[in-house]
A protein has these predicted regions:
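A compositional/structural signature for long, glycine/proline-rich flexible linkers
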Residues: 21-487
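Gram-negative bacterial Sec-dependent N-terminal signal peptides
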Residues: 1-22
Length: 487
């Protein structure tokens, strides 16, 4: 009897063992994001966790919320116009152009430049493709920077690429229509949100101001339904001024409002698809946003984290040492600009400090708040910036040195001068072939006035742009000159 019982128990054990081994010994490894478990909606997240994820979301989403808010504002214009008499605005699908350098009182974007004639237009490509019209610019440097919602450029369109005059079609990620006859090429955006900023070189002379007007009139965008294969033009010299003039002392228009951020991030998560590898971030951020909708206390913690992050992490990006990488002599240089990918540090830093950069091969940026000894630049001191002979920025296009006030904007001065460079045909070189530029609040004297950048009182920063740089610009082997305090 005992033997039979033992046999039965052994058989049962073996049977149970066989059943246990019917499942794979190794659990299959997930190979796609959909095979992973996602955050659980019902969990009760503590304040510390909510704020940690909220801070990450604020840093990550800042550039895209910035973009969508700019689009919402700019496209309220009923026709191409100048907001406050100085910033191009236009209805959705169209652009507006300046006909001269941007006015110094503008606050739409930090670090404006007075090297080019700007334009601006925003698009909603899930509604209809847009035709981008390119006139014949001759030998003049030009580039149309076309950005997606992430502020990455999505087109190679300009003089550096040998782009032809004509018509280009900008389409959304899901567009499957037919390309009309007469279109030079198709630009596919990665997001429905896109914008274009044409930049057209103009020398600081009466003659070139006149010469640039003809091509500028033909810089246009319009819905595909209006395309007829004929070059159109627009009289930008006589467009109306709408809206109130900005207050430069207040700094750049605040495009990201912390206590509205998470409402707007919800739209971003729905409108902008994840980049490869971003799926987990989207899952975490959606989980957070949904929790904030369900629980007012969670939303309060999210808003508190947004406010704090804006005052600390985001504010720190306004210091040039926290942008890009060291370039020598106290300068930093931009890195991955306008092709950020998952470089969130530089993407968010640029969005805060100098939105809408060009790609490095189009423009390389060098910037600093400090002199050669590491001391903060201040308008109460006089400085010299000397380029040794043969060491001007090596470019195929042109270069400039621009001065900004503490808000990364222009401050009015007696010469109405905010930058010096290739555009200035009256710069005076030293007998040894070097070029010295003077940065000071007071004039350095009549003989040096052509090389003078007037500085406001208070802290300042300097900014070099190298358009269409040579290899030494691209690989970082060219080093910006020292900024030396005059004793």
């Amino acid at each position: 009897m005992k033997l039979k019982k033992l046999v039965w128990l052994t058989a049962f054990a073996l049977s149970a063992g066989a059943m246990a081994q019917s499942a794979p010994l190794t659990i299959p490894h997930p190979t796609t994001f959909d095979q992973l478990n996602h955050p659980v909606a019902e969990v009760q997240m503590p304040e510390s966790y909510v704020k940690a994820i909220a801070q990450q979301a604020y840093i990550w989403g800042y550039p895209m919320v910035n973009q969508f808010n700019r689009r919402a504002t700019i496209t309220q214009a009923p026709e191409p116009a100048l907001n406050g008499g100085m910033v191009p605005v236009a209805p959705m699908g169209q652009l507006s152009m300046l006909t001269d350098y941007i006015k110094p009182a503008e606050t739409f974007v930090t670090c404006p430049n007075q090297d080019v004639v700007y334009g601006l237009g925003f698009f909603e490509l899930d509604k209809e493709p847009v035709v981008i019209q390119v006139p014949d610019f001759g030998d003049r440097f030009w580039v149309y920077a076309v950005y997606d919602a992430r502020t990455d450029q999505i087109a190679n369109l300009g003089k550096p690429y040998g782009s032809k005059p004509g018509f280009y079609l900008l389409v959304g990620p899901n567009w499957q229509g037919e390309t009309p006859k007469g279109i030079e090429g198709v630009i596919r955006s990665s997001t429905e949100m896109a914008n274009v900023i044409p930049r057209v070189q103009m020398d600081d002379t009466k003659e070139d101001r006149l010469a640039v007007q003809a091509p500028v009139r033909e810089v246009m965008t319009y819905p595909l339904s209006q395309f007829d294969g004929k070059m159109k033009s627009y009289d930008y010299a006589n467009i109306p001024s709408i809206g109130e003039k900005p207050n430069p002392s207040a700094g750049e228009t605040k495009w990201v409002i912390p206590n509205k951020f998470f409402d707007q991030l919800d739209n971003v998560l729905n409108k902008v698809s994840p980049l490869p590898g971003e799926e987990a971030l989207y899952a975490h951020f959606r989980h957070l946003v949904n929790a904030g909708k369900q629980d007012p206390k969670v939303r309060q913690w999210m808003d508190e984290a947004a406010e704090q992050t804006d005052k600390t992490v985001i504010a720190d990006f306004f210091k040039w040492k926290n942008n890009g990488v060291p370039a020598g002599n106290g300068w930093n240089r931009s890195k991955n600009n306008a092709e950020f990918g998952v470089d969130y540090f530089n993407r968010t830093g640029t969005s805060k400090s100098n939105m809408f950069d060009n790609k490095p091969n189009e423009t390389q940026y060098f910037y600093t708040d400090n002199d050669a000894t590491g001391v903060q630049l201040d308008g109460k001191h006089d400085y010299t910036v000397t380029f040794p002979k043969g060491q001007l920025p090596p470019v195929k296009g042109f270069w400039s040195l621009t001065l900004y006030n503490s808000k990364h904007l222009f401050s009015p001065n007696e010469l109405n001068r905010y930058s010096l460079g290739t555009k200035n045909k009256d710069l005076k070189f030293n007998p040894d072939g070097s070029l010295t530029l003077y940065v000071s609040h007071k004039s350095p004297g009549k003989e040096k006035i052509n090389n003078w950048l007037p500085a406001p009182e208070g802290t300042i920063s300097l900014y070099i742009r190298a358009y269409w740089g040579e290899q030494a610009i691209l690989d970082g082997s060219w080093v910006p000159p020292k900024i030396e305090k005059v004793k």
